């Protein structure tokens, strides 16, 4: 596939024939009506097929262990949240703040790539899923999901799986990518795009533990 070859040649940190570069990271125009431009690589990656770093939702640096005891915004467990809590029964000492979307200071894309990049919203993942075709494929020996826009341009999301504690045993079998949106009804969870290659399952899931380590694929808006 020609576009796949162009995507891989572009890399992630320099402009050599891709659709564009912002703050040193390449993006692809998939022809989406929102004008959203998707990064060619995961945050922490140098090539489209690299897994990159894993982040808990609302954290901006990778770590070795992902669970509630290491999560920044709780006091040790899922029902002791200290930020992004819409239900008092999930908050530490009944805490709520009604925050439902990542603040800029808690966005891994902004923290690592600078302003102009950010973690996609729920609606932007929906747009990608419904306005682009998607299929499982393998690039340079790495399995993942290829999204192709109506203009013929493509992005590849590697099957980096997710991390709970330090376990990533499903690497190469599934992918897990954060949105910037909280699960408002169950605030210990956040919204993410997930795919399971063997099941041909590609969908948006609301019930992802915020403390889990997911990939982040950044977006850039041109206007």
Where are these regions (language model features)?
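Conserved positions within compact, well-structured domain cores
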Residues: 17-223
């Amino acid at each position: 596939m020609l576009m796949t070859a162009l995507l891989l040649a572009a890399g992630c940190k320099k402009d050599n024939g891709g659709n564009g570069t912002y703050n040193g990271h390449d993006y692809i125009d998939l022809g989406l009506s929102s004008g959203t431009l998707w990064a060619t690589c995961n945050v922490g990656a140098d090539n489209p097929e690299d897994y990159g770093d894993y982040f808990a939702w609302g954290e901006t640096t990778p770590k070795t262990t992902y669970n509630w005891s290491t999560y920044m915004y709780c006091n040790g467990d899922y029902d002791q949240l200290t930020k992004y809590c819409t239900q008092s029964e999930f908050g530490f000492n009944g805490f709520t703040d009604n925050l439902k979307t990542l603040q800029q200071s808690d966005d891994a894309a902004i923290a690592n790539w600078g302003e102009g990049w950010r973690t996609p919203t729920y609606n932007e993942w929906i747009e990608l899923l419904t306005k682009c075709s998607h299929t499982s494929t393998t690039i340079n020996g790495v399995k993942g999901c290829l999204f192709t826009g109506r203009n013929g341009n493509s992005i590849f999301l590697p099957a980096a799986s997710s991390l709970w504690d330090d376990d990533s045993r499903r690497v190469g079998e599934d992918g897990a990518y954060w949105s910037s949106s909280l699960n408002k009804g169950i605030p210990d969870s956040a919204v993410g795009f997930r795919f399971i290659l063997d099941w041909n399952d590609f969908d948006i899931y609301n019930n992802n533990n915020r403390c889990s380590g997911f990939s982040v694929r950044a977006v850039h808006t041109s206007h």
